[in-house]
Amino acid sequence: GVQVLTGLPLVGGVGDFDRLTHPRSLMHFLGLTPSEHSSGGSRVQGGITRCGNSHCRRILTEAAWHYRLQPKVSEAIQQRQQGQSKKVQTIAWEAQQRLHKRFKTLSAKKKSVIAATAVARELAGFVWAIACEIKPADKPAAPEIIRTCKGKVYRLDANKKMAQTK
C-alpha cells in the first residue's frame, strides 16, 4: 500500500485532486506519459516525457518497486485501513493485485526499470481514483502546527493565523 512517506509528498505536490478530471491528467501532471513522434501515418512512442513534478514522479516510481512482491493485506495495512470506506479498501486491494501482475508480466519481457515506470504510471491512476473517492467531509482537518521562538510557544491553526500560547 501507499504509506505516509509516499502519500504526503503526493498530496503536497499535486494539491487538490479535484482539479484533475481524469487519471490521465494526473499521469500528465507527473510526466509519466510516453513521448510521441508522429509524422503522416506513422506514430512512434518513446520514453516518458518527464514534464511535471519530478519529486512526485520519483516517489511513485520507488513505490512501484514494491509491487514485485506478492500482494497481501498485512496487519500494518489493516490498521491503516481502519476508518476507510469499503470502496477505498476494494480499490486498494485491486490495485495491489493488478500492479503485481503487471510488474511480473512486464519484467519478464522488458527491463525491470521500465516495468517499474509503467507500474508507477498505473499506480498514479489508482491514487487518483482513491483521492476522488474520499469526499471533503472524510478528509481530516489540517493539524495545528506548533512553533517555538525565543522561549515562546506559537500555534499556527488551519487558517494560518499565529497565536501565542501560554
Predicted regions and their residues:
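Low-complexity, acidic/Ser/Thr- and charged residue-rich accessory regions of DNA metabolism proteins
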Residues: 41, 45, 78-166
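Phosphate-backbone recognition surface of nucleic-acid-processing proteins
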Residues: 4, 9-108, 165
